[in-house]
Amino acid sequence: AQVSIICNDPYFRSAKKETLVLSVSEARFEFPFSANIGEPIPVSERNYSTSGIINAGLVSTGMVVEFKAIGKITSRPWLTNLTSNQTMKLTGTETTLNQGEKITVNTNKHHLSIVKTFTDGTTKNILNTMDESFEWVQLLPGKNRLTYGADEKPENLLVTITVDKLLLGV
């Protein structure tokens, strides 16, 4: 007799998840200040540059990416891991987000999904919105550089990444 044991997810997970907000506001207002009459005074500025995230685990891991519309409209969001050169881009009318709506992409193995959440809390599976070159972006061990955008109004997008640190078992 032979007994086979299959473990599809043989990793221990860190108790604490790491969260990174890619699109952040940076303070621009300082005291003392001077102002020219008729010119606006910048209070803050959105930062759209690349962000670094460290995968402290010993193996590549997926993540949960949340694209949330914080302005009137945005559409066709994408995320690129510049370290691994992987890009996930969403296309089609289902990817248009009105203020308060969000798209959540889970790239963790055995949990792959793309779900749109509407402002009333209802959800819809939009797995069919993957671009033809879509990749389930993974984080390599060590430092990863991520960037994001959207084909329409990327300034209306708030992007949050949540990562589990995977640890090898015995």
Which residue ranges define each predicted feature?
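Short, charged, solvent-exposed linker or helix-capping segments at domain edges/interfaces
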Residues: 13-20
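Short acidic/polar capping segments at secondary-structure boundaries
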Residues: 8-12, 70-72
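Oligomerization/assembly interface segments of phage tail-like spikes and tubes
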Residues: 1-10, 144
